[in-house]
Every structure is written in C-alpha cells, then in structure tokens.
C-alpha cells in the first residue's frame, strides 16, 4: 500500500480503537461477508453499527480527497471491516471456511455447483443487457415484473450464472398457492 492507503487504514483502525498490527496479523483470516457469529451481545452490535457509520463517513471523505485505484478498499465495505475488526478487538478468532465460499454473478453457469452460495455481486451496469443486474432493482421488484411478464428476463445469456437467480424467482411465482382454510 502507498502512503495514502496507509493513512486510510490508520484512520479506520482509529475508529474501531484497534491496533493496526492486529489487522495485519489477521489479514489471512478476513474474507467476504458470509458469517456465522457466536458469543456477541447487543452492545457489540451497537458498537459495530456506530463504528461502521463513522468509518463510512471517514472513508468517503478520504476517497474524495485521494481517489483510490480500482481494487482498493471501497467505502461500501465499512460495515464489513467494522464487524471483523471489532471481533478481533474482543479476541474472537475468525476463519475462512469453504462452506461459506461463493460464486459471483459474473461467473459462467458451469461454476454454479462448485460452491454453496451464489453471491449476486460483480455484475456492473455495462453487463446489464446480458446478465441480471441487481442495481436496476433498487426501486423495482423483479418478482413483480416476472409476474406481469414471465419472459421479462429472456435477454439474459443462457451461460450466465445469473440465469439461476432468475430461475429461482420464476419458481417462486409459479408455485401453487395453498389454501389452508
């Protein structure tokens, strides 16, 4: 990391109140955002929330002053770092598990059965005419659109792993309704 990136890491550590050496020591035990968390309480989650908000704010200000290169830490990950670093600060051990590994929305459909989770991330706006782009559905419901037109997503490439996500939504709306009365 360059000097500017080092400063950002220092600022992030300051928010949590954690020593940077602890972060460096545990680097190999930091992964994505799939967690199984035990032995925490409401005070822990309150601190994670408050720290992530402050960290996001600091990261945003930093990014405006010193635009980071592609592949660097991104502001939207503030909550992930807050959670992870607060766990480490309290002495919790973290491990990366293949059981929580995932395939990306940008992957080819052949990878679908290789990992247990389909993480609908990575698809960018320039890909939205070939793959399912969740960014188009912040204020629209894709299931409702499928109810109105079952072929709504027919533009998705058959080899795109995102077709599995669409297939899942289709199966949801095609399930028979059960009358329990």
Language-model-derived ranges and their functions:
Residues 1-181:
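Glycosyltransferase catalytic domains, chiefly GT-A lineage
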């Amino acid at each position: 990391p360059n000097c500017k990136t080092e400063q950002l890491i220092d600022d992030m550590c300051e928010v949590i109140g954690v020593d940077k050496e602890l972060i460096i020591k545990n680097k190999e035990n930091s992964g994505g955002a799939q967690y199984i968390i035990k032995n925490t309480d409401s005070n822990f989650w309150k601190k994670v929330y408050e720290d992530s908000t402050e960290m996001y704010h600091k990261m945003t200000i930093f990014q405006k002053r010193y635009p980071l290169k592609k592949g660097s830490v991104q502001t939207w990950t503030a909550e992930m770092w807050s959670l992870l670093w607060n766990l480490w600060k309290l002495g919790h051990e973290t491990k990366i598990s293949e059981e929580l590994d995932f395939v990306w929305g940008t992957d080819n459909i052949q990878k679908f059965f290789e990992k247990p989770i389909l993480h609908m991330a990575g698809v960018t706006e320039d890909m939205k005419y070939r793959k399912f782009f969740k960014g188009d559905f912040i204020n629209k419901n894709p299931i409702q659109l499928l109810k109105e037109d079952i072929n709504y997503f027919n533009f998705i490439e058959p080899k795109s792993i995102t077709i599995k996500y669409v297939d899942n939504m289709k199966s949801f709306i095609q399930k028979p309704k059960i009358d329990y009365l």
